[in-house]
């Protein structure tokens, strides 16, 4: 027998309030330029009150950028403004900032030299300087703030994933594991898409020596497992799974089978196409075979936009589509009725149905 409608609504409200207070850890999947969708998702998480309860954030690649911004404990609007201060069109840089060539080089020649000397076509220097400046704004001018410094400032605990290709393993940078590493350094490594951006040698203190690192998404683009330890849960820890973790996962709007075939016109286009397929196949395979993650993950449509479309500008239709996609995905996950305030308490629902004439 079906439950009375008001009981069904009360049950739904209880489940909603439970979810809102359950989550303590937030994980962002990598996604390139599509990270703007996370800003839309954050707005709704804030509206529900869920964002206030988050204690730890983690991410790889673009997810590492989002996680770092969220760690500052700013409002969703302030976080979005910081994100929008990054000029995405300048991120793939052909000429390094502050460096002059002895001989005049065309941009293509500079990229070719970088590709053979530093194993990547573009420089990530513009992004790196932007990340340092954002951190400096939040850390009293200290652009080189470390993970330990972030703890001192009372930020959310931050976990950044990068791929150490010298040792063929994922490395997690955090106050627990690498307290003295500058956060900007870790984020730069995490977003360095192999072959697209220069590979980075890092010795734990500075670039230019040590192991080679690239985009964290190469090995682990959706690191929800980081928090699958009892120490990161208050009570909802069962069978080595932390149910207090919520993931934000950018998924492809179209399957690869439904897309028009892409025919590369040169070696660089081929490498870009191969990298995109590698990331997609590896991460989707891992996600689809993990039923646990599906139950603790908000799936956000990428609106058919590639991770490497660096020509997206704020205010454009594609930019708005991604932002709205993030908002709607969170609403769908929590089954939020846009006509009702997400902050209504269950007692109001009871009064509405029980005391109605």
Regions found by a protein language model. Name each.
Residues 1-58, 68-357:
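Patatin-like phospholipase
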Residues 59, 63:
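Gly/Ala-rich beta-loop-alpha elbow adjacent to hydrolase catalytic centers
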């Amino acid at each position: 027998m079906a439950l009375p409608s008001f009981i069904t609504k009360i049950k739904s409200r209880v489940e909603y309030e439970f979810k809102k207070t359950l989550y303590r850890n937030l994980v962002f999947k990598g996604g390139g330029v599509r990270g703007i969708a996370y800003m839309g998702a954050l707005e709704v998480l804030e509206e529900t009150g869920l964002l206030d309860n988050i204690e730890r954030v983690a991410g790889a690649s673009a997810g590492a950028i989002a996680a770092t911004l969220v760690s500052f404990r700013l409002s969703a609007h302030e976080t979005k403004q910081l994100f929008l201060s990054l000029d995405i069109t300048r991120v793939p840089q052909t000429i390094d900032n502050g460096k002059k060539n002895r001989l005049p080089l065309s941009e293509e020649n500079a990229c070719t030299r970088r590709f053979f000397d530093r194993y990547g076509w573009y420089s990530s220097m513009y992004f790196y300087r932007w990340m340092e400046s954002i951190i400096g704004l939040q850390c009293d001018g200290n652009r080189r703030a470390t993970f330990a410094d972030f703890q001192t400032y009372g930020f959310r605990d931050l976990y950044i994933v990068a791929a150490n290709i010298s040792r063929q393993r994922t490395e997690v940078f955090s106050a627990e594991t690498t307290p003295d590493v500058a956060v900007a350094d870790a984020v730069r490594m995490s977003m360095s898409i192999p072959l697209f951006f220069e590979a980075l040698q890092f010795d734990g203190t500075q670039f230019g020596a040590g192991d080679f690192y690239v985009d964290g998404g190469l090995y682990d683009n959706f690191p929800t497992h980081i928090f699958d330890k009892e120490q990161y849960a208050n009570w909802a820890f069962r069978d080595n799974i932390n149910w207090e973790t919520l993931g934000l996962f950018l998924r492809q709007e179209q399957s690869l089978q439904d897309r028009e075939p892409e025919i590369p016109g040169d070696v660089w286009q081929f490498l870009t196409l191969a990298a995109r397929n590698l990331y997609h196949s590896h991460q989707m395979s891992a996600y689809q075979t993990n039923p646990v993650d599906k139950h603790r993950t908000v799936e956000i449509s990428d609106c058919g936009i590639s991770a490497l479309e660096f020509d997206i500008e704020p205010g454009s239709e594609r930019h708005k589509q991604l932002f709205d996609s993030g908002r709607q995905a969170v609403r769908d996950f929590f089954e939020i009725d846009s006509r009702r305030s997400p902050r209504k308490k269950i007692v109001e629902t009871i009064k509405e149905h029980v005391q109605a004439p």
